[in-house]
């Protein structure tokens, strides 16, 4: 029944006591369906309760006397039975503590018995169905108006929902369902927040039980379409509630309905949005509680990867981000591989520990699921009847986990990730990092994370059983190295991509063992299980190279249209990873000699990629550290031998080299030949391949740093080639020549100065890779030779030196674009700051510092801008912790930084909302002041230098006195509150305290109290440190604060839009949302309590701790408040109970007065 105003009259007279004649009632067969009515003693005992029972008007006039008919007695007995069953059922469930599900099931049986009794007596003098529904109405109305002990109230709702479901299953009348629908519809429009919360929870339970137990065709969640549509529309209406606590149960209810198909005869109002669509839109709700429940309730699909990734990246609530990341565990890792790799890579590098832990949990679930599926596929038919006890419980000793095949699941993920990752150096580097985290997770799953790495290797070997080798891709171990790419049954059934994945995972596993070793003995013992001695490894690798060469005619991939390019990528990857494994092989003198000769023969292959050549040269350079000229001479002689032996397109074989990758190079030459109209490859084209190979090796040799000087021999041999290569049509040639000239200039700057000046004049017309190479080269030269590089800019008056040149690149770069040149310029400035002696008084360094500070304050719009900001902040943090002069450079740049933003014509670079300019710059001030704290310096610097914040305060006072009308002062003055006053001497604090008093008096009568408030905050902080008894003066609200207070409150609106706001792209710009729920309506305010006395602990002196402002620019302020926990039901949030009327017990007491 709907809530209504009950008119209470005088107290009813008590029923007269008369002799009971209950034998007639017990003999009536029409009311003997329940066993409770077969006991005459129970009927006699219940007659005493009849006196205190308030029934309907018809029943209350019936009295038990000798002249009463059997029908009248049965009516009263049935009414007592109904009341007793309803009260007992609801009371038992509400007060239950153990076996809650059993209690709900038993109580539902009692309610069904009472319902049947009322249904049988609906045609008697008194409609007992109305009595049954009134009792339900009274009990539910007492529960629905408040939300205290929510888990107990939820049990009652579950009880009614289960009862309705069973009544529907037994094909009984729908009186109870109709009554509940009317009850829900009425209370759903109540002004009471608790009533709306409980109503929505009630609907969710009804849908949940109907979906679970009723599967009738032509119905929706077990109910008729018309009835289900009413409840669905009620949930949809609840999504528009202004209270987030009332929207949460509605969102959870939609989670139960998201997988149920919408019927064709669904009403028009309900067909506008499906439950899943409404649930996904709730992921954008303004309240973090609603977003959290929406993410947790959704059943993720592969099409939701983009939505979940955006939530993980950009949501402002940490709990919501973690919940979205956990949903990836429910997705298969074999779809949208690249997006999932990027997401996990970023999460594993996130500064929040919870995000990193959740990402590792995703990896753990993927590994466990793969190993479980593999184990199930390996079970024989004879083992189906075996019952495994406690299969869900994890072993504490780890014995059961050592035969699970987790390591094979990790290799399967590696094969999957390699197919989706980018074939670039950065892509493979990120993938190796991801596999390293996966191995950490597997080590925990094997329960040996605290043991030496040798124990982990032993566990892996014991897990690789023979039946695993025959049915899955095997792990490469010491005993299987020689079978890589061999002509075996395994090689015939797998393509080269699988073999590449095996080798890649082998390399990652070996690197992991080397990094996680406790000592050399631990590493040697663990490595001996996966790598053979160096001499044996050389023999294996020589055979493997021949097999890699034969991949050019592999039958499984030769049918691809681009099989040459695909095979070339696989070949280079295999060779690269094998060389990386060779680094960890146990060495002996014969093995070292064989390894050196193998590297020389590999270096003579002109078809390798640049990354493979770099790797070979790095390994080979270790043998020529004492005599680098011998290596250069050997290389030059072999190049001349190649040129002399090259004939008619046939490349010579030098030092028994294996021409891996020749097919790809020949294909490119043939295509170039067809474009020019020639039939055969000319000698000029072949010589061009050798020349490019010479540049690659020369570049790799110079980067090793083993060369002692750029002698005349090298000048005569390479200078002309390098100058000609700068103007080449091939981009790779120009990049290689630029890098070589830059490295050569480090040894002899004079011989390369003119070439570098010509390149700088045409800098703007060069391609981006050439610009990046030139910036890196000039940076290395300036670090080595100082300001000599500035002479290259003498022709340009606007950019007189290298520092200004780099600053202009950073400033003029487009904000939204991803400019690689700008990123290299930022990195170059960072290297100059950290590797050169900086004078804080020089104008060029101040300008460069302002450029970095300005770029770091830009709004984050994508991953590229986040990378630029993190690079600058991390560099400045390290730079300012070296010495005092570095801190002075940052402090002297403060004025120009704030002056730039005060006169900026593009404030949207800082923030999209102009009204947040002061807030954003205040956060920037907090960050940059925190970087210059005196406590960040080494102890020796702290003792011999005074704090640089003294100079900062002097600069602020000078600016206030010199240009009081400047807008930059409003920003500059924000830095006062973040100064580390604790490190200042008492005399300095006393002087600052006195100066502040004069400025406070000067600005006391200002119209806008912003400056006055900022000065007062700093004044009180210093007074507290000095121990002065200063009267606490309240801050005067500024004009901005007054405008905020005058703005209309959002709580005046009745409904909130379902489509609220998009997830913020810039986390650092948007301020944290208000997570405090407001009242649903103006309620009576009780008198506040008297203020409590100050506890003794509060009177103790506490150390002054300032918030670390370095975290401000990294991420937005996080809400550390945890979401509401529900240990029992986990279904409803806690809401502020706002009653609209006294409780029924109070009304009853007033009516009896």
From Swiss-Prot:
<keyword id="KW-0158">Chromosome</keyword>
<feature type="region of interest" description="Disordered">
    <location>
        <begin position="1038"/>
        <end position="1153"/>
    </location>
</feature>
<dbReference type="GO" id="GO:0045132">
    <property type="term" value="P:meiotic chromosome segregation"/>
</dbReference>
<dbReference type="GO" id="GO:0000805">
    <property type="term" value="C:X chromosome"/>
</dbReference>
<dbReference type="GO" id="GO:0046536">
    <property type="term" value="C:dosage compensation complex"/>
</dbReference>
<keyword id="KW-0469">Meiosis</keyword>
<comment type="function">
    <text>Member of two distinct condensin I complexes, the condensin I complex and the condensin I-like dosage compensation complex. The condensin I complex is required for conversion of interphase chromatin into mitotic-like condensed chromosomes and for chromosome segregation in meiosis and mitosis. As a member of the condensin I complex, further controls crossover number and distribution in meiosis by restricting double strand break formation, probably by influencing higher-order chromosome structure.</text>
</comment>
<dbReference type="GO" id="GO:0007076">
    <property type="term" value="P:mitotic chromosome condensation"/>
</dbReference>
<dbReference type="GO" id="GO:0009792">
    <property type="term" value="P:embryo development ending in birth or egg hatching"/>
</dbReference>
<dbReference type="GO" id="GO:0010629">
    <property type="term" value="P:negative regulation of gene expression"/>
</dbReference>
<protein>
    <recommendedName>
        <fullName>Condensin complex subunit capg-1</fullName>
    </recommendedName>
</protein>
<dbReference type="GO" id="GO:0000796">
    <property type="term" value="C:condensin complex"/>
</dbReference>
<dbReference type="InterPro" id="IPR025977">
    <property type="entry name" value="Cnd3_C"/>
</dbReference>
<dbReference type="GO" id="GO:0005737">
    <property type="term" value="C:cytoplasm"/>
</dbReference>
<feature type="compositionally biased region" description="Low complexity">
    <location>
        <begin position="1127"/>
        <end position="1144"/>
    </location>
</feature>
<dbReference type="InterPro" id="IPR011989">
    <property type="entry name" value="ARM-like"/>
</dbReference>
<keyword id="KW-0226">DNA condensation</keyword>
<keyword id="KW-0498">Mitosis</keyword>
<dbReference type="InterPro" id="IPR027165">
    <property type="entry name" value="CND3"/>
</dbReference>
<feature type="compositionally biased region" description="Basic and acidic residues">
    <location>
        <begin position="1038"/>
        <end position="1047"/>
    </location>
</feature>
<dbReference type="GO" id="GO:0000070">
    <property type="term" value="P:mitotic sister chromatid segregation"/>
</dbReference>
<keyword id="KW-0131">Cell cycle</keyword>
<dbReference type="Pfam" id="PF12719">
    <property type="entry name" value="Cnd3"/>
</dbReference>
<dbReference type="GO" id="GO:0045144">
    <property type="term" value="P:meiotic sister chromatid segregation"/>
</dbReference>
<dbReference type="GO" id="GO:0051301">
    <property type="term" value="P:cell division"/>
</dbReference>
<dbReference type="InterPro" id="IPR016024">
    <property type="entry name" value="ARM-type_fold"/>
</dbReference>
<keyword id="KW-0132">Cell division</keyword>
<dbReference type="GO" id="GO:0042464">
    <property type="term" value="P:dosage compensation by hypoactivation of X chromosome"/>
</dbReference>
<comment type="subunit">
    <text>Component of the condensin I complex, which contains the mix-1/SMC2 and smc-4/SMC4 heterodimer, and three non-SMC subunits that probably regulate the complex: dpy-26, capg-1 and dpy-28. Within the complex, interacts with dpy-26, mix-1, smc-4 and dpy-28. Component of the dosage compensation complex, which consists of the condensin I-like components mix-1/SMC2 and dpy-27/SMC4, and the three non-SMC subunits dpy-26, capg-1 and dpy-28. Within the complex, interacts with mix-1, dpy-27, dpy-26 and dpy-28. Interacts with smcl-1.</text>
</comment>
<feature type="region of interest" description="Disordered">
    <location>
        <begin position="1"/>
        <end position="31"/>
    </location>
</feature>
<dbReference type="GO" id="GO:0000793">
    <property type="term" value="C:condensed chromosome"/>
</dbReference>
<comment type="similarity">
    <text>Belongs to the CND3 (condensin subunit 3) family.</text>
</comment>
């Amino acid at each position: 029944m709907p809530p209504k105003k009950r008119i209470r009259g005088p107290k009813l007279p008590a029923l007269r006591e008369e002799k009971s004649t209950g034998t007639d009632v017990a003999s009536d067969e029409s009311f003997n369906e329940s066993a409770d009515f077969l006991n005459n003693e129970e009927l006699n005992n219940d007659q005493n309760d009849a006196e205190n029972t308030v029934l309907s008007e018809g029943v209350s006039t019936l009295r038990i006397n000798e002249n009463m008919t059997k029908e009248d007695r049965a009516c009263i007995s049935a009414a007592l039975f109904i009341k007793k069953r309803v009260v007992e059922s609801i009371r038992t469930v509400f007060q239950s503590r153990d076996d809650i599900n059993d209690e709900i099931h038993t109580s539902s049986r009692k309610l069904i018995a009472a319902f049947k009794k009322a249904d049988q007596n609906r045609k008697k003098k008194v409609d007992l169905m109305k009595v049954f529904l009134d009792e339900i109405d009274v009990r539910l109305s007492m529960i629905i108006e408040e939300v205290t002990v929510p888990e107990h109230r939820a049990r009652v709702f579950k009880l009614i929902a289960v009862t309705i479901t069973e009544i529907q299953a037994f094909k009984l009348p729908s009186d109870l369902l109709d009554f509940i629908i009317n009850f829900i519809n009425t209370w759903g429009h109540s002004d009471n927040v608790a009533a709306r919360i409980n109503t929505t929870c009630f609907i969710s339970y009804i849908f949940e039980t109907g979906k679970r137990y009723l599967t009738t065709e032509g119905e929706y969640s077990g109910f008729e379409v018309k009835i289900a549509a009413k409840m669905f529309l009620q949930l949809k209406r609840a999504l528009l509630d202004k209270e987030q606590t009332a929207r949460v149960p509605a969102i959870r209810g939609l989670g139960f309905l998201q997988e149920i198909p919408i019927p064709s005869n669904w009403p028009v109002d309900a067909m506008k949005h499906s439950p899943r669509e409404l649930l996904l839109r709730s992921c954008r709700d303004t309240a973090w509680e609603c977003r959290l429940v929406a993410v947790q309730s959704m059943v993720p699909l592969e099409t939701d990867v983009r939505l979940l990734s955006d939530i993980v990246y950009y949501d402002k609530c940490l709990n919501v981000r973690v919940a979205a990341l956990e949903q990836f565990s429910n997705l298969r890792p074999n779809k949208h591989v690249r997006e999932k790799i990027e997401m996990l890579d970023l999460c594993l590098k996130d500064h929040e520990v919870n995000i990193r832990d959740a990402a590792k949990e995703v990896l753990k679930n993927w590994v466990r699921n793969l190993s479980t599926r593999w184990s199930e596929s390996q079970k024989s038919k004879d083992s189906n009847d075996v019952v495994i006890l406690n299969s869900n419980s994890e072993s504490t000793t780890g014995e059961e986990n050592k035969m699970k095949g987790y390591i094979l699941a990790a290799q399967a993920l590696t094969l999957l990730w390699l197919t989706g990752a980018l074939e670039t150096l950065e892509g493979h580097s990120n993938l190796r990092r991801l596999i390293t985290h996966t191995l950490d997770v597997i080590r925990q799953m094997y329960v040996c994370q605290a043991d030496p790495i040798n124990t982990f290797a032993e566990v892996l070997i014991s897990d690789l059983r023979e039946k695993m080798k025959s049915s899955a891709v095997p792990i490469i171990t010491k005993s299987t190295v020689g079978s890589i790419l061999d002509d075996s049954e395994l090689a015939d059934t797998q393509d080269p991509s699988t073999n590449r994945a095996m080798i890649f995972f082998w390399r990652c596993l070996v690197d992991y063992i080397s990094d996680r070793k406790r000592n050399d003995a631990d590493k040697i013992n663990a490595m001996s299980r996966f790598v053979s001695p160096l001499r044996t490894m050389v023999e294996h690798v020589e055979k493997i190279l021949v097999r890699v060469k034969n991949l050019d005619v592999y039958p499984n991939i030769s049918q691809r249209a681009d099989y040459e390019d695909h095979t070339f990528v696989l070949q280079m990857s295999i060779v690269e990873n094998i060389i990386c494994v060779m680094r960890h092989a146990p060495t002996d003198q014969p093995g070292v000699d064989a390894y050196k000769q193998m590297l020389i023969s590999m270096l003579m292959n002109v078809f390798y990629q640049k990354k493979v050549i770099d790797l070979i040269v790095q390994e080979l350079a270790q043998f020529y550290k004492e005599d680098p000229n011998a290596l250069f001479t050997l290389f030059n002689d072999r190049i001349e031998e190649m040129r002399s032996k090259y004939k008619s397109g046939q490349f010579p074989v030098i030092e028994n080299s294996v021409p891996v990758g020749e097919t790809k190079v020949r294909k490119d030459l043939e295509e170039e030949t067809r474009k020019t109209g020639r039939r055969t490859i000319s000698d000029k084209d072949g010589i061009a391949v050798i020349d490019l190979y010479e540049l690659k090796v020369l570049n790799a040799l110079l980067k090793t740093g083993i060369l002692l000087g750029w002698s005349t021999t090298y000048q005569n041999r390479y200078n002309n080639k390098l100058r000609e290569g700068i103007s080449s049509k091939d981009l790779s040639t120009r990049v290689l020549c630029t890098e070589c000239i830059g490295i050569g200039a480090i040894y002899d700057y004079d011989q390369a100065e003119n070439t570098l000046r010509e390149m700088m004049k045409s800098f703007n017309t060069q391609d981006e890779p050439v610009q990046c190479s030139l910036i890196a080269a000039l940076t290395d030269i300036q670090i080595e030779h100082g300001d000599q590089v500035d002479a290259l800019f003498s022709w340009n008056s606007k950019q007189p030196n290298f520092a200004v040149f780099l600053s202009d690149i950073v400033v003029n770069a487009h904000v939204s674009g991803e400019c690689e040149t700008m990123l290299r310029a930022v990195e170059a400035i960072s290297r100059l700051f950290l590797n050169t002696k900086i004078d804080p008084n020089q104008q060029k360094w101040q300008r460069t510092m302002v450029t970095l500070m300005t770029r770091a304050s830009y709004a984050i719009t994508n991953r590229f801008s986040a990378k630029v900001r993190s690079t600058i902040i991390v560099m400045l943090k390290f730079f300012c912790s070296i010495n005092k002069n570095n801190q002075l450079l940052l402090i002297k740049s403060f004025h120009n930084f704030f002056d730039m933003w005060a006169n900026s014509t593009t404030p949207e670079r800082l923030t999209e909302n102009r009204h947040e300019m002061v807030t954003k710059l205040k956060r920037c001030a907090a960050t940059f002041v925190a970087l210059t704290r005196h406590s960040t310096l080494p102890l020796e610097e702290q003792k011999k230098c005074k704090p640089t914040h003294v100079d900062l305060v002097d600069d602020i006072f000078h600016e206030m006195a010199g240009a009081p009308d400047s807008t930059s002062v409003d920003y500059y003055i924000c830095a006062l509150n973040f100064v580390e006053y604790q490190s200042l001497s008492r005399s300095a604090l006393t002087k600052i305290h006195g100066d502040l008093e004069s400025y406070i008096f000067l600005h006391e009568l200002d119209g806008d109290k912003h400056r006055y408030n900022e000065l007062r905050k700093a004044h009180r902080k210093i007074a507290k440190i000095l121990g002065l008894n200063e009267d606490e003066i309240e801050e005067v609200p500024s004009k901005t604060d007054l405008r905020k207070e005058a703005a209309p409150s959002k709580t005046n609106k009745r409904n909130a839009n379902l489509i609220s706001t998009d997830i913020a792209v810039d986390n650092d710009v948007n301020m944290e949302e208000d997570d405090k729920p407001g009242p649903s309506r103006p309620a009576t305010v009780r008198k506040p309590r008297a203020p409590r006395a100050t506890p003794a602990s509060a009177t103790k002196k506490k150390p002054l701790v300032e918030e670390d402002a370095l975290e401000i620019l990294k991420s937005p302020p996080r809400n550390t408040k945890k979401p509401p926990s529900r240990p029992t039901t986990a279904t409803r949030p806690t809401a502020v109970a706002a009653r609209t009327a006294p409780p029924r017990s109070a009304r009853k007491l007033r009516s009896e007065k």
